[in-house]
């Protein structure tokens, strides 16, 4: 069986991907929550039996103001992982973000993801970056829209008119697996149908009682709509729309 390393294995997407890879790869998990550190990945790669690294470990969120942590975890750690993968000829699949698109880069988080794409292109050209768009699913990451809705009360800015390509976590995991066999340097992973935040909230409200406060105020660092670079190949999947994805997420 092939062997893969997943960094950020205890995170929202990492846990889902570990389960999905069961039977496909022998998975080595690395996560700071269990004492691991992606920066120290090279000795594992030097053993010569690793087929892939799925690098998901990162400081997340546009609204994250821990700039030193973002620099350390998203930039320096990525440089270490990418250069090690290149040195040992190991396929690198890494999580990028819709915020890496220049039109969407409003924060240090987005800047770090854009840096990763450029660094990989120059120093690990066989890597494939996966631009994830607003991923949601069971056990959502703290601070995301779905998490805030389920743990309300929750303030919805701009009257819920902001537009996103909400993408189900199962589709994101399939795209990461697709990227392992892909020779493209960058791919998009997004539900082709966009929805307003209000539409997403209304769909969640079919399953849970929500405590929402809609305001017309704009949230700093936020974008009305996440622009999609259509010049970047989109992974061909049967993407679930929010009705299907939230049913899988919230149905008991």
Model-predicted segments: where are they?
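N-terminal Rossmann NAD(P)H-binding glycine-rich loop of SDR-like oxidoreductase domains
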Residues: 4-23
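SDR active-site strand-loop-helix element
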Residues: 7, 30, 53-57, 92-98, ...
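Adenosine-cofactor binding site in Rossmann-like domains, unifying the SAM/SAH pocket
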Residues: 26-45
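Conserved Rossmann-fold NAD(P)-dependent oxidoreductase catalytic core, especially the SDR/UDP-sugar
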Residues: 76-110, 128
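NAD(P)-dependent short-chain dehydrogenase/reductase
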Residues: 106-110, 114, 118-164, 169-171, ...
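C-terminal substrate-binding subdomain of Rossmann-fold SDR/epimerase-dehydratase oxidoreductases
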Residues: 157-252
């Amino acid at each position: 069986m092939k062997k893969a390393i997943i960094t950020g294995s205890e995170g929202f997407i990492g846990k889902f991907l570990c389960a999905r890879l069961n039977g496909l790869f022998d998975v080595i998990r690395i996560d700071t929550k269990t004492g691991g550190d992606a920066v120290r990945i090279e000795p594992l790669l030097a053993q010569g039996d690793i087929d892939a690294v799925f690098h998901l470990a990162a400081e997340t969120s546009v609204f994250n103001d821990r700039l030193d942590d973002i620099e350390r975890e998203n930039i320096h750690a990525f440089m270490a992982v990418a250069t090690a993968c290149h040195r040992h000829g190991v396929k690198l699949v890494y999580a990028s973000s819709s915020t890496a698109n220049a039109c969407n880069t409003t924060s240090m988080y987005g800047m770090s993801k854009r840096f990763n794409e450029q660094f990989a292109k120059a120093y690990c050209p066989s890597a494939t970056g996966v631009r994830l768009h607003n991923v949601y699913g069971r056990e959502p990451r703290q601070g995301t829209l779905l998490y805030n809705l389920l743990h309300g009360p929750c303030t919805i800015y701009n009257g819920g008119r902001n537009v996103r390509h909400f993408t189900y976590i199962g589709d994101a995991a399939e795209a990461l697996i697709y990227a392992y066999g892909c020779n493209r340097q960058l791919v998009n992973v997004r539900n082709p149908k966009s929805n307003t935040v209000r539409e997403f909230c209304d769909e969640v409200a079919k399953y849970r009682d929500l405590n929402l406060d809609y305001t017309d105020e704009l949230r700093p660092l936020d974008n009305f709509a996440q622009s999609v670079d259509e010049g970047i190949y989109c992974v061909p999947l049967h993407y679930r729309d929010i009705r299907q994805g939230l049913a899988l997420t919230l149905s008991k």
